[in-house]
Amino acid sequence: MKYQLTALEARVIGCLLEKQVTTPEQYPLSVNGVVTACNQKTNREPVMNLSESEVQEQLDNLVKRHYLRTVSGFGNRVTKYEQRFCNSEFGDLKLSAAEVALITTLLLRGAQTPGELRSRAARMYEFSDMAEVESTLEQLANREDGPFVVRLAREPGKRESRYMHLFSGEVEDQPAVTDMSNAVDGDLQARVEALEIEVAELKQRLDSLLAHLGD
């Protein structure tokens, strides 16, 4: 596949894609902004604790590969980064808003069911129903320039099969044995997480506003 990302590169690109949609007033992101986004505890699996130097290394690599570009000058006191991974002027990868939302959520959280994806991607795109989620996943799985996602075998105790992105290579389709006591309703859990994400982003916006008022 043309697009091959390491786990850390996937996290960085996923964060930039997410913030471009959910907090456009804070986008593009500085290095510190990318570090905060990579390490946030909501809507991330696994939760990471990356240092600034680790993130800077990933940013430099992605700029060299033309997946990101730097933005400086015109009032920016620090270098900022914006994604060119998809939907850029000269890039080949073109995705719909629904496709961006699903790909971003998969980059940030790994394999998930359609129900989990619908709830967790709601901040980026409001799917009308589960049929739209599933049809978008099928489109991503069958694109001529892809496939970009794959459907995994259904795990024990789960009602839905999970999907995973293919931007980091092929996925080993080996469902783990799941404790039935942990087989909670994925939709409900995802909705709770979506609310936590919304609260965290509102707090981030409030902190940013207070910081500007204090300048």
UniProtKB/Swiss-Prot annotation:
UniProt keyword RNA-binding present: no
InterPro entries (alphabetical): DUF480, WH-like_DNA-bd_sf, WH_DNA-bd_sf
Segments crossing the lipid bilayer: none
Residue(s) carrying N6-acetyllysine: 80
Keywords carried by this UniProt record: Acetylation
Taxonomy, superkingdom: Bacteria
Similarity comment text for this entry: Belongs to the UPF0502 family.
Protein name (database record): UPF0502 protein YceH
Organism annotation: Escherichia coli O139:H28 (strain E24377A / ETEC)
Gene assigned in the entry: yceH
